[in-house]
Amino acid sequence: MERPLCSHLCSCLAMLALLSPLSLAQYDSWPHYPEYFQQPAPEYHQPQAPANVAKIQLRLAGQKRKHSEGRVEVYYDGQWGTVCDDDFSIHAAHVVCRELGYVEAKSWTASSSYGKGEGPIWLDNLHCTGNEATLAACTSNGWGVTDCKHTEDVGVVCSDKRIPGFKFDNSLINQIENLNIQVEDIRIRAILSTYRKRTPVMEGYVEVKEGKTWKQICDKHWTAKNSRVVCGMFGFPGERTYNTKVYKMFASRRKQRYWPFSMDCTGTEAHISSCKLGPQVSLDPMKNVTCENGLPAVVSCVPGQVFSPDGPSRFRKAYKPEQPLVRLRGGAYIGEGRVEVLKNGEWGTVCDDKWDLVSASVVCRELGFGSAKEAVTGSRLGQGIGPIHLNEIQCTGNEKSIIDCKFNAESQGCNHEEDAGVRCNTPAMGLQKKLRLNGGRNPYEGRVEVLVERNGSLVWGMVCGQNWGIVEAMVVCRQLGLGFASNAFQETWYWHGDVNSNKVVMSGVKCSGTELSLAHCRHDGEDVACPQGGVQYGAGVACSETAPDLVLNAEMVQQTTYLEDRPMFMLQCAMEENCLSASAAQTDPTTGYRRLLRFSSQIHNNGQSDFRPKNGRHAWIWHDCHRHYHSMEVFTHYDLLNLNGTKVAEGHKASFCLEDTECEGDIQKNYECANFGDQGITMGCWDMYRHDIDCQWVDITDVPPGDYLFQVVINPNFEVAESDYSNNIMKCRSRYDGHRIWMYNCHIGGSFSEETEKKFEHFSGLLNNQLSPQ
């Protein structure tokens, strides 16, 4: 039944009247971010909580989740705990998400939907207005006062959009010996000209900020353990001795301002704020007694190999790690990633049970970084593959390697959703100041501009977009502290901003992806050559906090491989799509056949965001044979190589349609090929290419019997950004006798040590009972 127009209009107006004040109240409680649309992005400083509010940390945990959602866990009084869902609201969820660096909350969940937590239930009957600076400022029953069980643990779903410039405060500011003394700001101030001219700063006075004044710490009770903690905070793995005579002479020339307390560290702390307060220093400026006639405390730090100082001399005693038994994978920055350990020649992960800053710091120092600023849990830096080597690690902090720590070799109850990671302190190199993005719609995108020296002056200019790719964009985003690259643009249509920077000053850029800065990549130097020229051909990037990570199921390839002699009259689609070897053109179409090496491939997305094709819908290609669109022309390579690495046959699969075939647990499928659907692979899902579909093969009709290597490479041209490209290659040993084929030892590249990998490539026998080893 139709209603009169007036009735509709009145209802709408009434609804607007009800919603308007609610919307205004809601928006009034949110912080405003006008700077989000300005360049450059200022560093975000979280609103200060009242002095009487407890200092806490938050994290999201649980299984089957994205990085921006999970069970809410609170670190308070030295212990992680959960929050009860009683009286929880979207306003409280907003506070949680903003405290974790997300712009807002999308929703919240009750009844332990992300699994039951452990430890105390810190907060119950929580009431927030939505404008609190921290969850601790909301009203509740009090810390630990609850009648809830862990079946009522609350969870939140935050927006993927990050607050621009947000910086995590990863170290809890400890109240030293219950006094109102907080060591929040500390620095190493280079005193000698030798160190003032070098980056990073590795030697100088240790200074603490008291109010607005920087003050020195008296060395009367200063120890090497204190120095170790300070060096670790600033990204250095250890400390060393220094020339005291020079500093005595320098200190005698000027009056010092001393902090009235000393520190007492054990050397295992991740931050000096965790150290105890030492004896109070006797200071009496009226009687000219300062620091009990001592000197300002000095530290001299040992740099990791990656961060050895610039200059022709370099440091001969720079920290050089031995053959690594530990590595980091999947991180956006140097010194960040999922922890992987080498055991019995095979790389495996670490379970996050009992994972803490002390153990994480051992890993960081072992790799040549400083102490850990965060012990990452819940596979928030992506899931690994292979075995879980270590569980329930408990380090004292003095170990040289994580394998020296106590641990449980049994990993029962652990899975890769619990892979541990680290974020290490790294030295401040000042590299962010030499690069900027201009003209973007937000701080995470724009035209790349570099600061270079020309004719004795520093000038800003563009980077030539010719041959610019995702690997180069990755280096830019990392240098700027903006995470991973999501897109690399060879042409940019951004607002040009500073007209003085419209000149191309860098060209021919080629990066390996591991460089600290764009300047460390190969480029043309001052011999700039950019044939296309023009402002629109300046290189551009779009950055993202997260990235996907594709991994092939090697076991499935090994289990599903077989040979098929397929008649030519059944290969018409394959001929049209050029999926056969060149000799197929001479094969009789009525009586001839082709010998096909067939297999299934299952490609998982183990990363922290969805894998999306580079091209938009407008560039997808329709395939009549398959009756759907293909979104990526080159998604995987299938190659058969001889033992010298020479290609003897290859798959010619023309292009690919990406979709979610299956997903883990309760993860929802988002992509499908049918009906011109959206294409991609959701985080936690996989795309299955069955052995019986067209072009899922390698044509080996012309290949003679022998021993070979079978190789599959995902995303071979790096068209789409991933958090880890090292696991995109799968290799198998294969033996073909002219009638049958055996596939064995299939594994992902980088799964084994270099020594084991060499043995694999030169071993000519099978490891199963189908054929005897030679």
From Swiss-Prot:
Top-tier EC class: oxidoreductase
Biological process terms from the Gene Ontology for this record are:
collagen fibril organization; endothelial cell migration; endothelial cell proliferation; epithelial to mesenchymal transition; heterochromatin organization; negative regulation of DNA-templated transcription; negative regulation of stem cell population maintenance; negative regulation of transcription by RNA polymerase II
Q: What induces it?
A: Strongly induced in hypoxia. Direct transcriptional target of HIF1A.
Give the protein's cofactors.
Cu cation; lysine tyrosylquinone residue
Q: How is it modified after translation?
A: The lysine tyrosylquinone cross-link (LTQ) is generated by condensation of the epsilon-amino group of a lysine with a topaquinone produced by oxidation of tyrosine. N-glycosylated. N-glycosylation on Asn-455 and Asn-644 may be essential for proper folding and secretion; may be composed of a fucosylated carbohydrates attached to a trimannose N-linked glycan core.
Recorded GO molecular functions are:
calcium ion binding; copper ion binding; oligosaccharide binding; protein-lysine 6-oxidase activity
Q: Which reaction does it catalyse?
A: L-lysyl-[protein] + O2 + H2O = (S)-2-amino-6-oxohexanoyl-[protein] + H2O2 + NH4(+)
Result when mutating residue 626 to A = Loss of enzyme activity
This entry's comment on the bound cofactor is: Contains 1 lysine tyrosylquinone.
Q: Where is this cross-link: Lysine tyrosylquinone (Lys-Tyr)?
A: 653-689
Entry comment describing in which tissues the protein is expressed: Expressed in many tissues. Highest expression in reproductive tissues, placenta, uterus and prostate. In esophageal epithelium, expressed in the basal, prickle and granular cell layers. Up-regulated in a number of cancers cells and tissues.
The protein depicted here goes by the name Lysyl oxidase homolog 2
Origin species, per record, is: Homo sapiens (Human)
